[in-house]
Amino acid sequence: MNTLDFVDQASLREDVPDFRPGDTINVHVKVIEGSKERIQVFKGVVLRRSGGGVSATFTVRKESYGVGVERTFPVHSPNIDHIEILTRGAVRRAKLYYLRELRGKKAKIKEKR
């Protein structure tokens, strides 16, 4: 095993659920404000997953007061407390960038049965 692979293996998280683009998830993020630490929940639809290993990332999109907000998280980040899957989406694409232009009911994703 390569030394770099050994270091990467140590920083991988085991508690990451199996989620895909189209799923609606809650990402519980640790936020540090001054000396206090709290957990902030970011709820949205997974637009994409990219990369592999330690450098894997995913992007979540939500609408907040009529404005679209996208946030990209590293999958194995220590700043993520945990991820919970709310609904599974039935989509046929790996990257859901087309959701950026859609509004209202058209932006809804069918739930996988």
Curated annotation (Swiss-Prot):
It comes from the Bacteria. One of its GO terms (cellular component) is cytosolic large ribosomal subunit. One of its GO terms (molecular function) is structural constituent of ribosome. Keywords: Ribonucleoprotein, Ribosomal protein. GO terms for biological process: translation. InterPro entries: Ribosomal_bL19 (IPR001857), Ribosomal_bL19_CS (IPR018257), Ribosomal_bL19_sf (IPR038657), Translation_prot_SH3-like_sf (IPR008991). SUPFAM superfamilies: Translation proteins SH3-like domain. The keyword Mitochondrion does not apply. Disulfide bonds: none annotated. Belongs to the bacterial ribosomal protein bL19 family. This protein is located at the 30S-50S ribosomal subunit interface and may play a role in the structure and function of the aminoacyl-tRNA binding site. NCBIfam families: rplS_bact (TIGR01024). This is Large ribosomal subunit protein bL19. It comes from Mycobacteroides abscessus (strain ATCC 19977 / DSM 44196 / CCUG 20993 / CIP 104536 / JCM 13569 / NCTC 13031 / TMC 1543 / L948). The gene is rplS.
